[in-house]
From Swiss-Prot:
InterPro entries: Pex26. Interacts directly with PEX6 via its cytoplasmic domain. Interacts indirectly with PEX1, via its interaction with PEX6. Residues 1-246 are cytoplasmic. This is Peroxisome assembly protein 26. It comes from Cricetulus griseus (Chinese hamster).
Amino acid sequence: MKNDSSTSAAPMKGLVGPLRSSEPARALPAVPPAVYLLEEAADLLVVHLDFHAALETCERAWQSLAEEPTSGTVVEVKCSLCVVGIQALAEMNRWREVLSWVLQYYQVPEKLPPKVLELCILLYSKMREPRAVLAMADAWLQDPDNQGLPEYGSLAELHLLRVLLPLGRLSEAEGLAVGSAAFSEEQREAVLQAICTARQQHTREHLSSQEQQQMSQEGSFSHKLMSLLRLLRRLWDAAASHLLSQPFKKSLLAALILCLLVLRFDPATPSSLPFLYQLAHLFRRIQKATLSRLYPLALRD
């Protein structure tokens, strides 16, 4: 019992100091229920690995804080609840819901605590989706109330390195590095060196992509040309084989005769009759000569 009483009295001594006989006892400040819910959520997250229950506990704690007056303790508890909730969402592979989940409590990006914004930038940068957090970080950094915070310089550097440079927004990164007074000389020099390196890499990648595109176009043109030549060759082979075939020769001869008869000679005109008679006589002679070679005995009889 002695140990229990001394242990329970230790927090009271730290909070209100030693009591004197002449001083009236002062009441301890009430601890918001959200503090106990925060401890429960952290325990569920870290010890039990029950991420869904940890997230629900954070949401219940936020609801209980809606009726609490704003104080330093409440602000810290809200920030810690957001940190636990973000980690729970990330563990459940629901990291895309983090921004909307955070903004439902803080309404606007400018009101986010620096720790929460830092965690969002790191999360979306790790998942290779820095564009999702770009607008939020820009709004927070441009807010005049945030520019006086001690965390502003580190967040600006983090935003520059993890968001602007991966997105290729080199001009914005350079403007932030040069125009912001939050950077020290060492930070500014390191950031400008990183921007220069990123610009050189971007130039090399651009030239490489152009070369690959040019080679692809040349290869495509060569492929199309070879395909066209093969097609022409097949057409030429087909036409040559068709021209050399016996039925086509007969058809061509018949078509030539028809053209001579129809286009140059009108059977209705008297001038075409002698030619027609001669042509018919020629055909009869050819027929007679052919039949005489085939059937010589029959013709002699």
